[in-house]
Amino acid sequence: MADPEKQGPAESRAEDEVMEGAQGGEDAATGDSAAAPAAEEPQAPAENAPKPKKDFMESLPNSVKCRVLALKKLQKRCDKIEAKFDKEFQALEKKYNDIYKPLLAKIQELTGEMEGCAWTLEGEDDEDDEEEDDEEEEEEEEAAAGATGGPNFAKK
């Protein structure tokens, strides 16, 4: 099982009681077990306290310890690769940021100005001219309909 030197006092007592019961000690012959009341009693807070990490690792079997160490080494290798990736990714972002700067400056120049654009789209001029002509005609009709006084004052 486990080494008696590494066991705590509570563990060694429990093991001794189990061994006595298996060997047919006094309690087993009388039918009244001292282990039963001990199992019903709540454990002391010190026994319920979590073990420190070092003690926990020491309590594991060697095969599990080897796996844990191997996983730690693999995780370190993954961390190194990820750090290298992040470094190269930042360098690549910087490179393309420098390439995009002139284009972004032109976009800012075009969108940031309040003046009209010097470039025109095809067909845009025709639509603007038609809209202006329609507006002028409407204004003339409104003026003629409600005009009082003017060149045609005396209509006969």
Swiss-Prot record:
Region annotation (Disordered) ranges: 1-58, 120-156
GO biological process assignments: nucleosome assembly
Composition bias, Basic and acidic residues: 1-16
GO cellular component, one term: nucleus
InterPro entries (alphabetical): NAP-like_sf (IPR037231), NAP_family (IPR002164)
Coiled coil: 68-94
The name this protein goes by in its record: Nucleosome assembly protein 1-like 5
Source organism: Mus musculus (Mouse)
